[in-house]
Amino acid sequence: MVVYRLIEDPIFPHPDEAEPDGLLAVGGDLSPERLLSAYASGIFPWYDERSPILWWSLDPRLILNFDKLHVSRRVKRKVRKREYTVTFDRAFESVIANCARKFRPGQAGTWILPEMIEAYVKLHKLGFVHSVEVWNREGNLAGGLYGVSLGKVFSGESMFFLEPDASKVGFSYLVQWLKNREFHFVDCQQPTDHLKSLGAEEVSRELFLDMLDEALEHPALRGTWEFMEGEYEMITEVLS
């Protein structure tokens, strides 16, 4: 197969044209238009400072169906004891900066480069990218994650923790919040043992794209996300 070089227009080849490792295209930019076109097509950018922009569509793809969420006893205990408080869209730039600093075994640096941060901050301001913040009892950021929301699908980009299980607590609250709004699934993109431990499963690219098309039949939930009155306590009870 051929790896496509992108032109100025924010269009992509079909994901089925990707290489066996998932690499589909190279080049282009990180404009809001191109990024939204990518996510709507089941494609995401992932590269480092030594390479041009690379665009991927993996087969298989990792997703989380909400009824498969696994919450460990330890996380349940921390939720029950109110060790953390979870918010949305309160500190996006702090969350993505912490994700960029996160050490990842086997990687020499980070793929969340300055231009990547700038691009996702723009999408956050447009209401398409959202952050989850996890605060400890002292009011300090203990963990979090961020991702892209289109239609009824949330594509998780990265998560971090500064205290044990903080990101798992945030992810668990997010999943319940999305479920309450009839989202269809979370796109976890790349298979990792960590995400699989939370209940994520691999599906074929073909099935993923069918699920994505169905989820995109609904309008995006743009703007600042927040819990409805009484919802936070309800989710806390569910997760406990």
Curated annotation (Swiss-Prot):
GO cellular component: a single term: cytoplasm
Catalytic activity: N-terminal L-lysyl-[protein] + L-leucyl-tRNA(Leu) = N-terminal L-leucyl-L-lysyl-[protein] + tRNA(Leu) + H(+); N-terminal L-arginyl-[protein] + L-leucyl-tRNA(Leu) = N-terminal L-leucyl-L-arginyl-[protein] + tRNA(Leu) + H(+); L-phenylalanyl-tRNA(Phe) + an N-terminal L-alpha-aminoacyl-[protein] = an N-terminal L-phenylalanyl-L-alpha-aminoacyl-[protein] + tRNA(Phe)
InterPro entries per UniProt: Acyl_CoA_acyltransferase (IPR016181), Leu/Phe-tRNA_Trfase (IPR004616), Leu/Phe-tRNA_Trfase_C (IPR042203), Leu/Phe-tRNA_Trfase_N (IPR042221)
Entry annotated with the keyword Acyltransferase: yes
Protein's GO biological process: protein catabolic process
Compartment(s) where it occurs, according to its Swiss-Prot or TrEMBL record: Cytoplasm
Alphabetical UniProt keywords: Acyltransferase, Cytoplasm, Transferase
Domain of life assignment: Bacteria
EC number: 2.3.2.6
SUPFAM superfamilies for this protein: Acyl-CoA N-acyltransferases (Nat)
Primary site of residence: cytoplasm
Listed GO MF terms: leucyl-tRNA--protein transferase activity
Assigned protein family: Belongs to the L/F-transferase family.
Protein task: Functions in the N-end rule pathway of protein degradation where it conjugates Leu, Phe and, less efficiently, Met from aminoacyl-tRNAs to the N-termini of proteins containing an N-terminal arginine or lysine.
NCBIfam families assigned to the protein according to its UniProt record, in alphabetical order: aat
PANTHER family: LEUCYL/PHENYLALANYL-TRNA--PROTEIN TRANSFERASE, LEUCYL_PHENYLALANYL-TRNA--PROTEIN TRANSFERASE
Name of the protein described by the UniProt record: Leucyl/phenylalanyl-tRNA--protein transferase
Annotated organism of origin: Maridesulfovibrio salexigens (strain ATCC 14822 / DSM 2638 / NCIMB 8403 / VKM B-1763) (Desulfovibrio salexigens)
Gene (UniProt): aat
